[in-house]
Amino acid sequence: MSPQTETKASVGFKAGVKEYKLTYYTPEYQTKDTDILAAFRVTPQPGVPPEEAGAAVAAESSTGTWTTVWTDGLTSLDRYKGRCYRIERVVGEKDQYIAYVAYPLDLFEEGSVTNMFTSIVGNVFGFKALRALRLEDLRIPPAYVKTFQGPPHGIQVERDKLNKYGRPLLGCTIKPKLGLSAKNYGRAVYECLRGGLDFTKDDENVNSQPFMRWRDRFLFCAEALYKAQAETGEIKGHYLNATAGTCEEMIKRAVFARELGVPIVMHDYLTGGFTANTSLAHYCRDNGLLLHIHRAMHAVIDRQKNHGIHFRVLAKALRMSGGDHIHSGTVVGKLEGERDITLGFVDLLRDDFVEQDRSRGIYFTQDWVSLPGVLPVASGGIHVWHMPALTEIFGDDSVLQFGGGTLGHPWGNAPGAVANRVALEACVKARNEGRDLAQEGNEIIREACKWSPELAAACEVWKEIVFNFAAVDVLDK
């Protein structure tokens, strides 16, 4: 017998496998203000008790492994282990439970969303004892929040930079998303901006392809927005997508955007990755650039109700990693988004303090302390008839983004932009006068059509376009 084995034997080490719940299920545990708290939707395999499943999640996402190891004796498990401290049965669902897990803050590197997710949603999601696992929510303690820079600038600073107050901002994604030359792309940008939009946008998959290299696109878009600014007297922006195959190339593109003097760049934060996103957010803070975030790939992760990560968690992670805008769904458009759930994570993006509210899917009270807020972006299948609902749902601190709803106007891009701006101004005016946008929305739009032929034409084109599909991800009953 080796000296090491003799030493461990003397303190009671016993090799073998024991149930996770004996170590990691601790219903008596009182959570600390510094703990990261997680709510998991757990679907155990047949025959696996919920307590064992919840404890397995806590173990495999913190200090545990499948067998007892002698090196456990070289550290303090009580200090570092995750703890499943509560389990609730999901009403109306067979064999589904919400397992609450507390993680000590010392498990995580400061200022790193990458490290946080590597632990909490790493290998545990492939664990055989679970049929499915979904991370529903996280509580990020103020002590950890303060290690992040967060959004480069935030809502108020953006409004001050743009000199735009008292209404939602208007945007448009240039279509077709792929295939235009840089010059034709810039022309479309110019027409939309001179028509009254605040922003135009690269689509998420516009990077640097053979038909339009990034440097050419940046130059023509900068020319377009400066020309539109000179004609309208308003500050304009175009989301120049800096996403690239390497972090070095991404930063190079952001540097060129700064040299052109444009106000905003863009990043695909899930496909690009949190490390790249945080790096770009830090560059934008240091160099006065706003940062628009697209959530391409999110539905692969968040759409299924029993497995993956809920978007409210991805939204919190983005606020920590850094971004001034993020796409959030529309409630009324073509993309998934149930109203109460959407409004729940919109508040988590914008507000400083959000109370627990299970009716909106918010499992934990979240205090963001001094972290700036993020503007939610409503985009996807929306048009002028949706304007009253969007204004009522999202309020002033939002970006309403009409791609096809601008470029599909029968008279062209600029009239499409005019129609959207007129519809927005009419809705804001009506709201400020005390009218009910939810009840009187269609009437408000029809009244505005009388003095805007561009809006009237848009209303005629899209009068019968609806997307009546039930949401897949809905609140538990």
From Swiss-Prot:
Post-translational modification: The disulfide bond which can form between Cys-247 in the large chain dimeric partners within the hexadecamer appears to be associated with oxidative stress and protein turnover. The disulfide bonds reported in 3RUB and 4RUB may be the result of oxidation during crystallization.
Residues at the catalytic site: K175, H294
Modified residues (N6-carboxylysine): K201
Cofactor(s) needed for function: Mg(2+)
Residues reported to bind Mg(2+): K201, D203, E204
Family note: Belongs to the RuBisCO large chain family. Type I subfamily.
Name listed for the protein in its UniProt record: Ribulose bisphosphate carboxylase large chain
Designated gene of the protein: rbcL
